[in-house]
Amino acid sequence: MSNRALCREASHAGSWYTASGSQLSAQLDGWLSQAQTSKRPARAIIAPHAGYTYCGSCAAHAYKQVDPSVTRRVFILGPSHHVALSRCALSTVDIYRTPLYDLHIDQKVYGDLWKTGMFERMSLQTDEDEHSIEMHLPYTAKTMESHKDDLTIVPVLVGALSESKEQEFGKLFSKYLADPTNLFVISSDFCHWGQRFRYTYYDESQGEIYRSIENLDKMGMGIIEQLDPVQFSNYLKKYHNTICGRHPIGVLLNAATELQKNGVNMSFSFLNYAQSSQCRSWQDSSVSYAAGALVVH
């Protein structure tokens, strides 16, 4: 490797998760040991991207389904929190650093994606400011450590895509989703509830506010499990649930639909659901987390 390899630093290490490799490794092992293996080998997972103290244990339920003896390349699709983006963007670097070990971007796949003309480049500043992809790097490194020399990653920052763009990107990524050696990591939290998020939907028939939030999230999760992008869009239009990874999820659902049209049999199941706290009053706020996995039969 030349000294000119460009790196993205682990900019959220030391704040959103520990910067100590040994501590991080032990933490991730601890959470993974609490989760069951039930949907292996996963072809895609949905997992949260909050600080690990909030969602580390939830995310483990998705990562437990990853089979390092099968997976060789990990696509990480994360929503853009800081820059307005109407398409998807690729990184400008070669290496993503983690406190565990460096992850190498698959430049061959990046080249093929770039050639489509559907992507833009994100600046290093945007790359390092964004946490939605980075929060999946330590878990990716941990679950793949037994095969780390064969591993490449394909980070993709997903913008505020229209439904037709979600369909186009879904179609493009479907050929990669068809390959058993690829894993898709879809980065998303679920409901952001409270006045600070300007979202306070409440169905009183559910009882406490946190129960209403759970019911709303699980309605959306049920639609995702049906792998139905149109229904998912309709659900978001109706309830406006603040699912920050709605566009990466939309891309996955469209990719899955494309493969199902071609006779590929698959199923998606959620394995864990959690809330950062239980909202009982209008002063409260919470973020929901869900972990799930897609398997191809």
UniProtKB/Swiss-Prot annotation:
Organism domain of life: Eukaryota
CDD domains for the chain: MEMO_like
Pfam families named in the record: Memo (PF01875)
InterPro entries: MEMO1_fam (IPR002737)
Matching PANTHER family: PROTEIN MEMO1
Quaternary state and interactors: Interacts with ERBB2.
Similarity section: Belongs to the MEMO1 family.
The protein's role, per its UniProt record: May control cell migration by relaying extracellular chemotactic signals to the microtubule cytoskeleton. Mediator of ERBB2 signaling.
Protein name: Protein MEMO1
Species: Xenopus tropicalis
